[in-house]
């Protein structure tokens, strides 16, 4: 997997099982994870690779630019990325864009909200605007 995709799947996606392990253990740091939710991570990873726009054996040759093109042309319906990619996908129209949580099968996760991978996140209440 090239560097343009590496961070999405080995960093951001991996944050989900690590978050739940930290939450269960009541910790915010550790030298080594136990791997409590690694099977959940594997299942979401398998869902990704077995439903990609290319064969799993071809994934190592694909880049973030390929993923963007697949999404913009309608070959892909889901596209895991951040707001910084908006300029590259805005031509599909705002009515065709949305945010979807990534569930990995942990009890209660439907109440957690959207995971973000950013240093800064501003949220304003509609009533305060």
Short names for language-model regions:
Residues 1-30, 76:
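Extracytoplasmic/periplasmic solute-binding protein
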Residues 5, 9-12, 37-48, 67, ...:
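Stable alpha-helical elements in mature extracytoplasmic
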Residues 17-20, 48-56, 75, 89-93:
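Sec/Tat-exported extracytoplasmic proteins
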Residues 29-61:
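Glycine-centered hinge/linker elements that transmit conformational signals in sensory
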Residues 53, 91-129:
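Extracytoplasmic/periplasmic substrate-recognition and gating elements
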Residues 58-72:
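Short helix-initiation/N-cap motifs at beta->coil->alpha
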Residues 64, 81-86, 118:
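Beta->alpha turn/N-cap motifs
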Residues 73-81, 95:
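Alpha-to-beta junction loops
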């Amino acid at each position: 997997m090239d560097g343009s995709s590496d961070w999405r799947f080995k960093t951001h996606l991996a944050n989900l099982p690590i978050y739940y392990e930290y939450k269960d253990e009541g910790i915010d740091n550790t030298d080594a994870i136990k791997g409590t939710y690694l099977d959940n991570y594997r299942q979401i990873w398998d869902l990704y690779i077995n439903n990609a726009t290319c064969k799993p054996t071809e994934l190592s040759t694909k880049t973030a630019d390929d993923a963007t093109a697949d999404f913009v042309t309608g070959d892909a319906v889901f596209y895991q990325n951040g707001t910084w990619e908006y300029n590259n996908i805005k031509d599909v129209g705002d009515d065709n864009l949305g945010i979807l949580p990534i569930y990995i099968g942990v009890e209660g996760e439907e109440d957690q909200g959207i995971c973000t991978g950013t240093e800064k996140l501003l949220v304003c209440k509609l009533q305060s605007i």
